[in-house]
Amino acid sequence: YSQVLKLLDKEKILQISRETKGSEAYVKRFDGYQHLVVMLFGILKHFDSLRELEIGMKAEAHKLGHLGMNYLVRRSTLAEANIRRPQEFFASVYAYLLEKYAKFLADSRPAKSYKGQTHEPKDWEKLLYMMDSTTITLFDNILKGVGRHPKSGKKKGGMKVHTVMKYHVGVPMVVQLTSAAKHDHYLLKEVHLPKDSTLAMDRGYVDIAQFQRLTEEGVCYVTKMKKNLKYEVLESVMYVNTEGLVAHIDQKVRFTRGELIHEARRVEIFYANKKPVVLLTNNFDFTVEDIAEI
């Protein structure tokens, strides 16, 4: 644990805490750095409650000085800090650490030669981001009240974790927590990527207005297409393989939502023993193979 803390710049973290609105408000002793240290201690020890965390800290009381702690925090103090200190502080610390140590993270892209197969790195791999969500069911008795009542009468309780990850980094760039009932495309509104980036996502994130925003910002997206989307076909080309079978259909389509007009590329790929896959993108330069790989 002390080795982990050596990677943390205490003064920089305190600076982030002071610059985050409300992070150091009404704070006497339990500053942002000490709060971070305590929470990391609880995570690494796999504690599930503040009571466990308090007991664990007491058991390690003789080592607190080595952790940069100058006193033993009480459970009530920690509970109040969890309420008062804004999450933006921890998000800023994470962003700072990611920027500082990203170069030391393992590159998850396939090697140029692996198990006899060669892989030529593509230009788009360098700026490829992936977005997805995972639902966490909350089954403890104390958490059974979380969620909403749908028409079926069954409660959709739990949390949903929305994540944006850079392809070759392998750790989240953005993490948002919402109720399980929150629609996936919620996070899409919050995502702002560098120009010329490519964003891969599932069909749950389909939002024509946000797709137009990404296009205007110079960001490429690739996603699976929903069946119920209404669109107008502007151009259509059918490609046939050497066996005379349809390999894929490449179309330029237009979506109209009131005054909003968004033009995109619809690619339907056919397989011998599988259902066809329909993909949607705003990139008209990628090959069909690249789009399918993304």
What are these regions (language model features)?
Residues 76-80, 99-105, 239:
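Short alpha-helical linear motifs
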